[in-house]
């Protein structure tokens, strides 16, 4: 949700995200300096397993501020990056133009048509090694939509295309996951598309770590491509039945607001970000002490969902 950025950034009513806005850059700098205290020694150059680091993420889908991208690049180097830097974007010219830097390795994100898409990259920047940083095994599931599925033959067929043109790829996702609480986020194009709690994504391993038909198909293909013998796989994870849970007590939500949150008095409704709240809900209450004629209640600028009592 919100790209992992903290909600309190928007308490600055002039805040501009993912660009060369000084206050935003200062917060990014603070974060990176603290981050590298944790990951600096984990780089391949130091004997670790971090082989490369990415500048931003699909920035060409959002903006084209080259000063900002150069700032992030320099910040990462100043913080101690010793491995290769790269960018990762969609395949059309506007995305590649906005999200890349001339002297930084460029990678692509897509889920099919590898040969065609890498040809588009060649037109944009010749002789670039072919790398798909996000090979999409599936897609997001949104509330109210059908569950996205993708056949194992389709996934394996795309991987074969990568192998046929000597391209590299990274699975997105290899292991299904879970968006806990309110962290799922959403897409928002012509309409708002909230993502469900599950991040299954038709990954090769399920959300609970079990094998899928696509896993076996891709495994067979890769073993054959590398002339490797088939070895025994770890056992599938054991599942358990939780059983019946008896609930014999309850309480009113509205009678417990003071136990669940902090009360604030403000002249006008403020957003969650104003209070530094990343997710969840806010209960707004007001008293109409004057006499009003009956009229339609209008609530503007609701972002996500509002319940009116």
What is each model feature region?
Residues 1-9, 91, 99-114, 254-260, ...:
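Contiguous N-terminal and early-domain "leader" segments and peripheral loops that mark the onset or edge
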């Amino acid at each position: 949700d919100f790209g992992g950025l903290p909600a309190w950034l928007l308490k600055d009513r002039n805040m501009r995200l993912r660009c060369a806005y000084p206050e935003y850059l200062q917060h990014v700098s603070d974060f990176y300096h603290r981050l590298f205290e944790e990951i600096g020694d984990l780089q391949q150059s130091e004997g670790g397993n971090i082989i490369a680091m990415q500048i931003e993420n699909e920035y060409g889908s959002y903006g084209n501020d080259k000063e900002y991208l150069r700032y992030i690049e320099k910040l990462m180097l100043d913080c101690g990056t010793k491995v290769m830097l790269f960018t990762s974007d969609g395949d059309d010219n506007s995305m590649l133009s906005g999200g890349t830097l001339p002297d930084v390795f460029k990678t692509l994100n897509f889920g099919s048509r590898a040969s065609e898409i890498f040809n588009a990259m060649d037109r944009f920047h010749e002789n670039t090694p072919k790398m798909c940083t996000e090979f999409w095994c599936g897609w997001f599931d949104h509330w109210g939509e059908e569950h996205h599925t993708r056949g194992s033959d389709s996934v394996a067929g795309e991987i074969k295309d990568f192998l046929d043109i000597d391209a590299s790829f990274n699975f997105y996702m290899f292991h299904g996951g879970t968006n806990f609480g309110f962290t799922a986020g959403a897409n928002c194009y012509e309409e708002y598309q909230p993502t469900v709690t599950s991040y299954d994504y038709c990954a090769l391993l399920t959300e609970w770590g079990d094998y899928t038909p696509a896993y076996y198909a891709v495994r067979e293909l890769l073993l054959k491509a590398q002339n490797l013998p088939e070895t025994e796989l770890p056992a599938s994870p054991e599942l358990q039945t939780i059983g019946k849970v008896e609930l014999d007590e309850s309480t009113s939500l509205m009678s417990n607001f003071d136990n669940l949150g902090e009360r604030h008095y403000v002249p006008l409704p403020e957003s969650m970000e104003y209070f530094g709240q990343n997710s969840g809900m806010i209960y707004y209450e007001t008293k109409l002490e004057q006499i009003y004629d009956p009229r339609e209640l209008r609530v503007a600028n609701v972002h996500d969902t509002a319940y009116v009592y």
